[in-house]
Amino acid sequence: MLYNRCKDSKICLLFNNHLDEEAISRMDIRYSCNQRDFKRYTTEETRNEMLITGLYKADEMVAVYSHVDRMVTLGCMPVHEEVSIDKGIDVWANFGTHYFLERREIGIFNIGDGAGTVTADGKEYHLNYKDCLYLTKGNQKVTFKSDDPEHPAKFYMVSAPAHCSYENKLITIEQAAKRPLGSVETCNKRTINQFIHPSVLKTCQLSMGMTALEPGSNWNTMPS
């Protein structure tokens, strides 16, 4: 059941029908857990709760919603079709909004072998490998396509709630802020590429980056 405030802000209506049950079930929903219960998880239970797999399916939008910070992780690999951001997602049932980014912002990375294009409200953004696109709250129609179906783009995305709007921005790997860390001796020499970061652009609350390990290095952060 969902509550929705009417435009005049005087009446609150309750809706519990006309929901796309298939679309709701297609989005994986993860719940938070307390530390006492987590101590008793088996390896399989830990993987089921904490690990995201199967993000990329041809011409599909795969989404995982977490009740921790209300974050949504998405994966899209368009091959033969142009894929909408809300494909397979009942936005009204899951978020109580009329379109995906009505009250959300999103960061988009292309981690695929080929280049791709993201179209937001009619404006196209071309993403090569390791490029990033920030879309602010309020973009109504967002679609994804690959330049070459033989070498499709793979869009990795994270969306967070947003209460204010800024500007959409394409950030290339060259434009990202660089932060070198680690050393060869400890096998963790790496560069933190800060794409969606206050030093690069303004966002509501989302930050995203990409870590690049140097040859011979094999870990990022040592588990505590």
Describe each model-derived feature in a short phrase:
Residues 109-112, 116-126, 143:
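Long, mid-chain structured domain cores
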Residues 6, 11-71:
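Non-cleavable N-terminal signal-anchor transmembrane helices
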Residues 144-203, 208-210:
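Surface-exposed beta-loop interaction hotspot
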Residues 121-137:
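Short acidic-glycine-tyrosine-enriched beta hairpin
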Residues 115, 132-133, 137-145:
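Histidine-centered metal-chelating micro-motifs
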Residues 55-94, 187-224:
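A short glycine-rich, His/Asp/Glu-containing loop-to-beta-strand
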Residues 101-116, 210-215, 224:
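Short, conserved beta-strand element in jelly-roll/cupin
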